[in-house]
């Protein structure tokens, strides 16, 4: 592979060739999605459908070209059915719709769920690339990204070539690039194109961060998963799922997908037989539900954690501000794992990967070596030093549980230095409102100062979001303009934090992490937390030593 290869160039080389539509018709019918086919006001039979040649698939009417199959997906703000006529005018060969449009002279496959049909269409178009890869899906509220980085490191140390789809980065072949988007699990077409590029680049495995959104919205339908990992399950995304039960059920559906069948066969890849395995956090209250679903799917279950009944169990943990040392027992034997990562929460992330190694029968020493080599993950417990007398940590924590874990780590570290924590964070607009006061209370109970600011307000009034967080902080004893400040502009909030920081304090900048933008009412605006913090420090006279 050329040193000049980029993710874009690798992806551009991947596209399905022209295909007869009848192959997709059979697939949609077998999957229980197809309700019929029509053109205008009349039904279309199999013979006519078989004569239609598809040159491309898209769910974006602006990308339609002659021969395209246009999939009309109803969205939260825009319904794709509105654009079927314009797709026809642009030369589309056919459309997939949930409701027939008799006034549009275009062959239409009428389906139960267009999003699910889009995912099946994408898998069909790109030749089911997940069947040529071992696929490791990682789900959970927190810890997915760190666990995915650790999993890739362990697999590569065991001489297993890895691709990665995740919040922070995409990796195809040996090329890894930052993910500029705010979406962890991409849309079905991009996801299947990425998997095909991995297979073409001779990756053996795809490690895929698999979100509840991606599961519930059918983005990952058509992917043949082999390993499913649960990190944990806490309060998040209720604005999308509507209830805790629906959120949990979306996560559970990943483990249901481990069942062997025509769409998810047992794979023989590179001389390795890929088992179906479920890796479950034994310390999570929902462990039993996930293990039960995995058992019904026929997967091998390996649990991990500190619970005495866990298959991979931490027996001894030593930690300092920068490292972890974990003694553990596993089916392959007892061992000690050294990590260049701080935070007791990373014990579970690492043990999940050890458990994955047990299922895949990887060399335990290679797994430990891979884990030991991970020095950090962008935007996760990232320290910033420019000679200032206080600490700065950038972290992606944006849920109540993740914020609590990070503050529980930093508060005693700051206290040992004679200081406290200044927490700078916000909460996403047009998202779960219930978590806002929860996060405010968590910060108030652990931080010396709480500065509430924008995260991604989107179209919601920023001060409404900040007030929701402030209510929780006030319940925790904070008082406005004393130890609680509401500053919508994120740069100004960081300035306020640094100006108030005392020697020994630790300033936590939470919620943005690796992200490269803030989403406002008019869309994303470029923003880099690290560069912003460095610029503020420079204004205070602190500049990093270029030699360090």
Give names to the regions the model predicted.
Residues 97-100, 210, 232, 282, ...:
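Short secondary-structure boundary segments
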Residues 117-278, 289-297, 543-544:
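Phosphate-binding loop of NTP-binding sites
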